[in-house]
Design a protein with these regions (language model features):
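A conserved structural/catalytic subdomain of Rossmann-like adenosyl-cofactor enzymes
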Residues: 2-207
């Protein structure tokens, strides 16, 4: 994962030159975020490294704070990058993690899972998994890190929370995940514990 909330001012000229001269043939054709957070630049760089879908495609996972999900006005850099990802149907899942997992911050974090070779039943949908309660306390705190995700392969008495999370993602069961809803700009506008009225599914349509 990239460092949270790191500005990219020192790289600004190089990045904007690539954006303007290469467009979508380069890494940053979808746009650039605000100067004080380069997370979505890092994500675009990773997407550029994905194997082409006709060659088998790729799946990537990246840990972000909440900023790439929620910040940016309609038509702004963050919004346009999200729109590009949603329109290409690359976002497969978002996993909300427990707080206090990292040494130097206690903020909320999320795993983004992206794929350019989605299985047919996942196409046009984004799965949101709420894993905020899948934690066990650290025996000894390390800075802000007071929790970890239970993993019996590491500590045999742990609950298998990693297995639970990966199982939810793999099974893609209706009703087992929450809904994430996007506006026309690809911005998350609401996250609900239940599906919209009249629809019991636990996945959201991205279109």
């Amino acid at each position: 994962n990239p460092p949270f909330g790191v500005e990219w001012k020192q790289q600004q000229r190089h990045i904007e030159n690539e954006r303007d001269s290469l467009g979508y043939q380069g890494r940053f054709g979808a746009g650039t975020p605000r100067i004080n957070d380069g997370a979505l630049l890092f994500l675009q760089h990773m997407i550029a490294k994905m194997r082409r879908a006709e060659e088998g495609g790729s799946r990537i996972g990246i840990v972000f704070n909440g900023s790439p999900l929620f910040t940016g006005d309609a038509g702004g850099g963050e919004s346009e990058i999200r729109r590009w990802i949603i329109e290409n149907d690359w976002l497969e899942a978002v996993v909300a993690l427990p707080e206090q997992l990292f040494y130097n911050t206690g903020i909320s974090t999320y795993i983004w899972v992206l794929s350019n070779h989605k299985e047919p039943h996942r196409k046009g949908k984004v799965q949101l998994i709420d894993a905020r309660n899948h934690w066990v306390p650290m025996e000894k705190s390390l800075g802000n890190k007071r929790r970890r995700i239970g993993d019996p392969s590491d500590k045999p008495k742990d609950p298998d929370y990693i297995g639970d999370i990966t199982g939810l993602h793999g099974r893609f069961e209706e009703g087992a995940s929450r809904w994430v809803l996007f506006d026309k700009d690809g911005k998350v506008v609401t996250v609900t514990p239940d599906a919209p009225t009249g629809d019991a599914r636990g996945v959201a349509t991205a279109g």
